């Protein structure tokens, strides 16, 4: 009888422990870290923006952390896949947290450019090269997949690769060697400091959402660090990406479709801030009529881009916006349409409102306002006015701290002495 009672007590205790263990497991916060490839998603057939959406929908998190600085969040444009994830979150009533962080007191890339010219770098780079050549994990990776440069150049590796063990083990070893040789500094863009600061923001999101499902989207080179840090937290259940496979196909919302196709990020910006309206539309125009080289050589802008830009501006105007930025863009489009007198008329309407243009972008708006006006005057045979506009452009470059060598080569060139013609830029 006593043995029977003892057995009952023992079984009860075992069941109790199992129940407690199961309850504790259920109350853990599930966290999945997803490595992304930033601009690479735009033309990677195996890791597209749609794949980002499929990953989000398959995991269906309660909370989404995105690699956007808090100061930029819902106010300025940032990494496209992070904005897509934000829009997905807002469209589906998810909490979205910005978790990016950068050191603002120094320019690590400028530091690195100077440092790689020193003798100290030459010595340490040889040490780093030796460590890489003798690292079995890194060499096995290169034999299997090729160099990292070739991987990024070909841009065909999929989401399983960037979220798999081989890639993340390689990145871990790469940063371990870099920090061992150079320290946590400009050569690795202060990666340890940045990752630690980002983890602080991630931990805030976790603390405010205990027991929930959280997805962290971050550049693929951060994933190894976050996985290691999160695996050490008792209240966190780190989710393996492989458990999501195969992914579901998620139908995008109209906001996401509009953003992927036309860069019009509706649903992302905080529209209670009236200035966000201008940011929404102006950012949509950037890839259309202000892409690489387009402002310096407008002849490379496709006609289809101009057509799309006209549509964006028309919608912007329907918001009853009277912003100087809108008028700047309208004048630029008129110039692209070869309506030079129309462009001059619009430009002159904001000559006394240039201070209303975004101060952080005066180096662009003010400088190109005068340069573009000079173009229009030259195209309408008003040479004296054109020269004055180019002089104002040069003056603005100096005042706003634009590199004068760059300005002379790409912006105002020699237009004070040689009139601008559309043909010369072809």
Language-model regions, residue ranges each:
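Flexible helix-coil transition and linker loops at the boundaries of alpha-helical arrays
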Residues: 257, 265-276, 313-320, 352-363
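Boundary/linker segments of alpha-helical solenoid repeat arrays
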Residues: 318, 323-326, 354-366, 395-422
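TPR/TPR-like (Sel1-like) alpha-helical repeat modules
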Residues: 348-352, 383-401
């Amino acid at each position: 009888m006593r043995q029977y009672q003892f057995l009952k007590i023992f079984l009860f205790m075992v069941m109790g422990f199992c129940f407690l263990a199961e309850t504790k497991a259920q109350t853990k916060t599930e966290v999945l870290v997803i490595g992304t490839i930033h601009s690479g998603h735009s033309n990677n057939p195996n890791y597209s923006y749609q794949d980002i959406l499929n990953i989000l929908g398959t995991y269906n998190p309660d909370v989404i952390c995105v690699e956007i600085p808090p100061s930029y969040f819902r106010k300025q444009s940032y990494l496209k896949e992070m904005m897509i994830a934000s829009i997905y979150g807002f469209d589906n009533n998810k909490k979205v947290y910005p978790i990016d962080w950068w050191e603002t007191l120094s320019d690590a890339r400028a530091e690195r450019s100077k440092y790689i010219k020193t003798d100290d770098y030459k010595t340490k780079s040889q040490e780093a090269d030796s460590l890489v050549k003798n690292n079995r994990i890194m060499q096995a990776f290169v034999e299997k997949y090729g160099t990292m440069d070739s991987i990024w150049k070909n841009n065909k590796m999929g989401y399983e690769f960037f979220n798999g063990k081989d890639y993340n083990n390689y990145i871990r070893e790469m940063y371990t060697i870099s920090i061992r040789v150079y320290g946590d500094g400009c050569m690795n863009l202060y990666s340890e400091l940045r990752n630690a600061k980002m983890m602080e923001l991630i931990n805030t999101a976790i603390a405010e959402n205990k027991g929930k499902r959280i997805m962290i989207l971050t550049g693929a080179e951060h994933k190894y660090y976050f996985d290691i840090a999160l695996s050490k937290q008792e209240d966190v259940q780190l989710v393996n990406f492989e458990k999501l496979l195969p992914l579901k196909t998620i139908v995008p919302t109209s906001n996401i479709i509009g953003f992927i196709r036309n860069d019009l990020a509706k649903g992302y910006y905080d529209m209670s801030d009236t200035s966000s309206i201008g940011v929404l539309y102006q950012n949509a125009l950037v890839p259309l009529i202000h892409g690489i080289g387009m402002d310096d050589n407008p002849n490379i802008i496709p006609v289809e881009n101009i057509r799309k830009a006209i549509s964006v501006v028309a919608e912007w105007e329907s918001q009853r916006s009277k912003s100087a930025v809108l008028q700047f863009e309208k004048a630029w489009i008129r110039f692209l349409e070869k309506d030079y007198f129309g462009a001059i008329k619009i430009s002159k309407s904001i000559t006394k409102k240039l201070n209303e243009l975004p101060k952080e972008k005066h180096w662009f708006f003010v400088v190109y306002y005068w340069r573009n006006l000079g173009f229009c005057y030259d195209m309408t045979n008003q040479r004296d006015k054109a020269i004055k506009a180019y002089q104002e452009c040069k003056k603005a470059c100096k005042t706003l701290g634009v590199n004068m060598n760059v300005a002379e080569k790409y912006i105002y060139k020699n237009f004070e002495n040689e009139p601008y013609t559309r043909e010369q830029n072809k």
